[in-house]
Amino acid sequence: PFVFRGIRDYTSNDSLKNVNWKATARTGNLCVNEYNESVSRNVCILLNLEDDGMLTYDSVNEEAISLAASVAEEFIRQGINVSLISNACDVDTKEAVGIREGAGVGHLGSINTVLARMDLKLEKEEFAELINRTFIENVSVQSSDNSVYVVISASRRKKLQQTMQKFEKKYGQVIWIVPYMTGGEYSLDYCGIRPEGWEVK
């Protein structure tokens, strides 16, 4: 069994599944838990901007987009391939945005352009359905031990949690970051994924 040894700064040889998000948020630097030596070279950002059926705060969605950009920038800086899938739509094409995996400054620019062109007023596909269609029910998509999936979603609907539980069983290495307003909560009661709260002040 692996033993937890502490927290230190991230290096390009670390596995992304060992990122300590709370320490990263606190210090401003990407930090990892020391205990696992496997290496992940691909990260897929799954950005959900659907309403939760409750009060919707523009600041939470804006923070989620900003967080996606920051996550992409940090991983690309470390030489890791990054892809992005979202249910938000492009302002002109009116279609859900996405970008295939890639690395380098040019790829980061493409990701930032895609994020900047999102029109949050356009109707969005339910994220659970998007994940089902794109991954779980798509036999051509193979699971990879070399990938980490970073979910950024303030919505914590029961159906979405149950879908992500199936996703984790098939693909593994899922990190769920929940942007939430100060005084709110970010628990995931319908799946076994441990949430990382991201407070929006």
Residue ranges and their predicted role:
Residues 1-8:
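Intrinsically disordered, low-complexity linkers and stems that provide flexible hinges
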Residues 9-201:
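Exposed, interaction-prone extracellular/peripheral surfaces
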